[in-house]
Amino acid sequence: MDFANVYLGLDTLGNEGYGASVSNGTHHDFHFNFNTFRDGGNHEVGEKRAESSDIGVYECRGPVQGPKDQTSFPSNSHNNYASIVGDASIGHYLKGPERTSEVSLPQTVNLSEISNNNDKGQPTNTPPVRSTIVAPSLYSEGSTLNHYNNGSHQVLHPQFQNGTNAPYVVQSNLMQNNVNLTGAEQEKGLDLYKNSATANNDEIFYNLESLRREGYLNSNKKQSQSPNGDYNSSDESCSNKTVASSQRRGTPGSNNVHTASNNETPDMKRRRFLERNRIAASKCRQKKKLWTQNLEKTAHIACEQSKALRILVSQLREEVICLKNQLLAHQDCNCEGIRQYLSSEAQGIMSFQKH
C-alpha cells in the first residue's frame, strides 16, 4: 500500500490539502482516518477512510518536508496534518517522537513536487495536484465528490489493495507541466498534434517520391550516355538511314519530316538521338535479362537432374553389392548358374592380381 497514493486519491477538491490523524486497527484490519482542511485551518465535517490489508499502523504527525528526490522525511509533532505533493521518492516514513522506531513503506512513491504546510494548514509552495490527473483510477467507479463530503467511507480500488502493485506514476514531463489544462484544451492539443503529424508524413512522402523520380531519371541518363556524353553511332546511322529513305519516297509526310529536321537545332537533335538510344538500350537490357533468367532456369534444372542421377547410381551400386553377397551366401546350393558366376568372378580377380 502506497502511503502517498492515499493522499492523491483523496485529493479531489483541487487546492485543498488532506492530513492523516493517528490510525487505529487490529492485526488484520488496519486503516487510516483522514480529515480534510482548507486554507486557514478550517476542517471539514466529513471523515474519509482508506482500508487495505497491507496498510500498517503509522502515526502521520507533522508536515512532510524535504528537498526533491530525498528518500527520508522526518515527522514533527506540532502539527497533525501533512499534505504530500511533488516529484520525490519516499522510501520510508518516521513516526512521531513518542515512537522513535522507523516504519518502512511497502513501495516507493513517485510524486511531482514537495510542499510544506504550516500550523494553519496553508501550503507554502505548490498546491496539491488533482487526483483526476495524477491518479484517476484510485477509487472504484460510481463514487462522487458529494459522496465523500457527506462523511461516508470509501474503500480503495482493488488494484491498490495489493502491496505488489506499483504506484501510479506520471512519466511524461508534458503531463506534469500541463496538469491545470481542461479536457477541451487537452483534446485541442491532441488534434493539433495529430494534424501536424499527418502533415509531416505527407511532406516526407512527397519528398521521397520526388527524390525517387529524380534518381530514376538520373540513373537512366547515366546508363544511356557515354562518359563523354556522346550518343551511340549505330543509332545515329539508323536514324540517318530512316530519314534518307523517307526522303527517297517523296511523300508529303516525308517532306514534312525533312522540313522539321531542317528546322531543328543541334540541341534538339541531340536530345532526340539520346531518347532513341535510351529506348534501344532499355529493350536490349530487357532481352538480356530474359535470356539470363532462362539460362539460370536451365542450369537449375540440369543440376537437379544430375543430383537425382547421382543418387540413383549410388542406390544401384548398393543393390549390386547386396546381390553379390546373396550369391556368396548361396554358393553351397546345387545351382549351376551360381557356381558358374562365382568361378568367373574368381578367375577375373586372379587375372587382375597377376597384371
Swiss-Prot record:
Residues 218-271 are annotated as: Disordered. GO terms for cellular component: nucleus. GO terms for molecular function: DNA-binding transcription factor activity, RNA polymerase II-specific; RNA polymerase II cis-regulatory region sequence-specific DNA binding. GO terms for biological process: regulation of transcription by RNA polymerase II. InterPro entries: bZIP, bZIP_sf, bZIP_transcription_factors, Leuzip_Jun. Keywords: DNA-binding, Nucleus, Transcription, Transcription regulation. It holds the Pfam family bZIP_1. This is Transcription factor atf21. It comes from Schizosaccharomyces pombe (strain 972 / ATCC 24843). The gene is atf21.
